């Protein structure tokens, strides 16, 4: 058994909560939790605790929810905890240098990609969007930059041809906690070996937007198919048909050519809706029309065949 560390945990969503749960099952002591302030959620816009706060309260762990760390009070609260280390996972607040320097061993972060490949807010989505063969989690010593700290541990896994951001999120949420526990064991034993990042290899994983998710049929079919998976579950790749916004849940690339303009429907039957792109043909397999759940193309065509007639130009 490695030395027990006094840990302050900072995180907010479910991804972070799974890492907190792993820490609570380890030999380490979680002495406090930092998470974002309760936010309105649901139809009633009722103030709702984050998944991390929920777990912390279940285990009687003190919870701190500052809007930021600008006040002397917030800084002093953290200092008074006398933590060995702060573990940060999808916290959502920028940490100033004074916070990074407060725990004896500084702050470490679990990042959802193989650094330095994707720094920034949407590394899971961008790895699929770009067609990367693998992804993973990187645990790094935090510095004042955006995901620029020295790397302490990397765990990898392949990106399968069927992976969406939703499925990859689940995989990384399972991979990260084990990597974190291993990394903390190395830190506690004084065996951690920081590796500097090569800035030349870094890309910025910018946030996704609904505008970006609108399909441009002039793109390559392979790129559109990756976007469909990368933008699932949000913001969802979409296009217009019969003046309705249609979300694409599943598609595949068909290696065929056509002299028809991009966006033209070549074929529409139970095997899919075949659409000309800038390079290749994209076959739409599962769609969602306004007010309905996602359905197979066969079911869509049973009720809305007129929207997808051969020769129709999608926009």
Swiss-Prot record:
<feature type="binding site">
    <location>
        <begin position="113"/>
        <end position="116"/>
    </location>
    <ligand>
        <name>(6S)-5,6,7,8-tetrahydrofolate</name>
    </ligand>
</feature>
<comment type="similarity">
    <text>Belongs to the Fmt family.</text>
</comment>
<dbReference type="GO" id="GO:0004479">
    <property type="term" value="F:methionyl-tRNA formyltransferase activity"/>
</dbReference>
<dbReference type="InterPro" id="IPR011034">
    <property type="entry name" value="Formyl_transferase-like_C_sf"/>
</dbReference>
<dbReference type="GO" id="GO:0005829">
    <property type="term" value="C:cytosol"/>
</dbReference>
<dbReference type="InterPro" id="IPR044135">
    <property type="entry name" value="Met-tRNA-FMT_C"/>
</dbReference>
<dbReference type="InterPro" id="IPR005793">
    <property type="entry name" value="Formyl_trans_C"/>
</dbReference>
<dbReference type="InterPro" id="IPR036477">
    <property type="entry name" value="Formyl_transf_N_sf"/>
</dbReference>
<comment type="function">
    <text>Attaches a formyl group to the free amino group of methionyl-tRNA(fMet). The formyl group appears to play a dual role in the initiator identity of N-formylmethionyl-tRNA by promoting its recognition by IF2 and preventing the misappropriation of this tRNA by the elongation apparatus.</text>
</comment>
<dbReference type="InterPro" id="IPR037022">
    <property type="entry name" value="Formyl_trans_C_sf"/>
</dbReference>
<dbReference type="InterPro" id="IPR002376">
    <property type="entry name" value="Formyl_transf_N"/>
</dbReference>
<dbReference type="InterPro" id="IPR001555">
    <property type="entry name" value="GART_AS"/>
</dbReference>
<dbReference type="Pfam" id="PF02911">
    <property type="entry name" value="Formyl_trans_C"/>
</dbReference>
<keyword id="KW-0648">Protein biosynthesis</keyword>
<dbReference type="InterPro" id="IPR041711">
    <property type="entry name" value="Met-tRNA-FMT_N"/>
</dbReference>
<dbReference type="Pfam" id="PF00551">
    <property type="entry name" value="Formyl_trans_N"/>
</dbReference>
<protein>
    <recommendedName>
        <fullName>Methionyl-tRNA formyltransferase</fullName>
        <ecNumber>2.1.2.9</ecNumber>
    </recommendedName>
</protein>
<keyword id="KW-0808">Transferase</keyword>
<dbReference type="InterPro" id="IPR005794">
    <property type="entry name" value="Fmt"/>
</dbReference>
